[in-house]
A protein has these predicted regions:
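Periplasmic-binding protein-like
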Residues: 106-113, 178, 182-224
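Extracytoplasmic small-molecule ligand-binding "clamshell" domains
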Residues: 5-87
């Protein structure tokens, strides 16, 4: 799951401001199993519940704000959201654009395609023979594709949409997080004819706050106590 940033708006304790407002605004995209809507239209998922547990400990409500992930650091630095908590991969670029907590989960980027085709593609070089590979713009999947030298990529607005491109046949494959691939492909899912094969990069998830925010250390401390 790393772009432009604006001037930092943190002028006082983020923790104090959040507690005074009574709300923690969390920037997310719809990304199962981390953040997605249930049948009632309510946000649920691993990161959703984790964020709500943190909010409860802070004594504030949690508001989930859908953002364009490709513009996430602008959303953060402008104050539109207080943090980014959406299966966000910790990267060197991210550390320059924001203040990120210690890792709370491990993951990997994987290539998803139709089960009937997966046996034909066993290496990253094989993937270069595909017509198109869908990726989420600004995601770890995009960086993994770049690192693998894949130029046959098409950008989607989210990982869920990248997966839809494969289901519909608009793309031959997609690169998404292992957590999503496990939750949304194979038997018992809506994409039973899809599977994943090649793992591209291992990664760790963290939560991003504004540069200089005291929420980073506070959240790292609270996460350690919750895990």
């Amino acid at each position: 799951k790393e772009n432009n940033k604006k001037e930092d708006t943190t002028t006082q304790s983020d923790l104090a401001k959040i507690q005074a407002a009574g709300v923690l605004k969390v920037g997310i995209t719809e990304y199962e199993p981390m953040n997605y809507k249930d049948k009632k239209g309510e946000w649920t998922g691993f990161d959703t519940e984790f964020a709500q547990a943190l909010g409860e400990k802070l004594g504030v409500k949690v508001e989930f704000v859908e953002i364009n992930w490709n513009n996430k650091y602008n959303e953060l630095s402008s104050g539109a959201v207080d943090c980014l908590w959406n299966g966000m991969t910790i990267t060197d670029e991210g550390k320059k654009a924001a203040s990120i907590t210690n890792a709370y989960a491990e993951n990997a980027q994987v290539v998803v395609m139709k089960q009937s085709e997966v046996g034909k593609y066993k290496t990253t070089d094989d993937l270069k023979n595909l017509k198109s590979i869908a990726i989420e713009g600004g995601s770890a999947g995009e960086k993994a594709a770049q690192a693998a030298g894949l130029t046959n990529t098409v950008v989607s607005d989210s990982q869920a949409l990248a997966l839809t491109e494969v289901t519909s046949g608009s793309a031959d494959a997609c690169i998404i997080d292992l957590t999503m691939a496990n939750a949304m492909t194979g038997e018992g899912t809506g994409n039973k004819n899809l599977t994943y094969s090649i793992k591209l990069e291992a990664e760790e998830y963290g939560i991003a706050f504004r540069t200089g925010s005291d929420m980073t250390a506070k959240t790292t401390e609270m996460l350690a106590a919750m895990m």
